[in-house]
Amino acid sequence: MLDQNQLKKYNQEHLSEYEKLMSSNEKEKLESKVNELDLESIQQLFQDLYVNRQSISDVSSVSEVKYQRKTELTDQEGAKYEQKGIEAIRNGEFAVLLMAGGQGTRLGYKGPKGSFEIKGVSLFELQARQLLKLKKETGHLINWYIMTSDINHEETLSYFEQHDYFGYNPDNVHFFKQENMVALCETGQLVLNEQGYIMETPNGNGGVFKSLEKNGYLDKMASDGVKFIFLNNIDNVLVKVLDPLFAGFTVVNDCDVTSKSIQPKDGESVGRLVNQNSKDTVLEYSELDEAVANTFDNANIGIHAFKVAFIKQAVNNDLPYHLAVKKLKQLDEDFGVVEKPTLKFELFYFDIFRYATSFVTLQVNREDEFSPLKNKEGKDSVETATSDLERLNLI
């Protein structure tokens, strides 16, 4: 039986009503899961991030990041960075980390987002091609680490196997799953998914480093002599995966965190790379007052390089949760399936920046390096991604 006092204390009494309609086996699973949860912490998250949520309007502690515009590099500087990058890649100083835990639902596609194809070429293949090109240029096959999630892990592995890893050596591709976090309804109560279990959703990309560590991959990188982790996500179809110039820029500056950015447009719903309290960080657009957001010159495009030594030192430090509200299918009080606004609590990888001591950013051209694929139609859509890939002769 569920602990009624605990349920009442933390606003979860509705679970008793669900329990009455469950089989013995279902009751056992529900009780086991609820007993695993820290209901006090979950309620505190609900209060802090939903009930008392605020946008950031005071920018007294926020300033522009230290950055270099790629367009302002001289030919000699660009060539120097490229050469340094090629040397570092050849010497095995970089690993590549891809965050690919999402589904293609918003594209009208059933399956891992990375397996979505544009004119017969999947997002995974677009990135694999670039890594294979680097192998030709440097003679070194980079270890490729790919973070999946419970919702797409098996399908992702199957997709790679069906496509012979796009010509990549399977021994150099390492898959691991991000962890989950419970979801809540807008009154702070746990919800049941369509299968009747406590709903959990991927805990955001901020769990990427702990998941790397848990799977032994941080230790592997260190033992392999890897000094930097190049990180990117599956959304950006124009990402330059570990381009030598950025690799060289990373090596020469030798910072804990090296980032790429673009000049944001006013009102653009993209996080801003800023310096807050003497630390570089990303402030999500949804967390900023709009007028404040428009004062900063660097939009985060999810491309960074991290020192392995820094990540190993900071990996177990606490990161804050952020709130996302999304319509998700769940069970109502009669066990019918409904779709309702649901609170998801997510960790963001960039919150690890607060533990770093050195930062630098390279601002690149949007037209060359940023085209997010988020929607089936309209802005940031299949149509815009296709157009951008064709414009740069990438498909």
Curated annotation (Swiss-Prot):
Indicate yes or no for the key word Transferase: yes
Binding of UTP occurs at M99, A100, G101, G102, K113, Q178, G204, D235, K344
List GO molecular-function terms, semicolon-separated. Answer: uridylyltransferase activity
Report the EC code(s) recorded for this entry: 2.7.7.-
Entry keyword Transferase = yes
Q: Which domain of life is it from?
A: Bacteria
> Which N-terminal residues, if any, form the signal peptide?
none
Q: Which UniProt keywords apply?
A: Nucleotidyltransferase, Transferase
Q: Which Pfam families match?
A: UDPGP
The family assignment reads: Belongs to the UDPGP type 1 family.
List the protein's name: Probable uridylyltransferase SH0870
Record organism: Staphylococcus haemolyticus (strain JCSC1435)
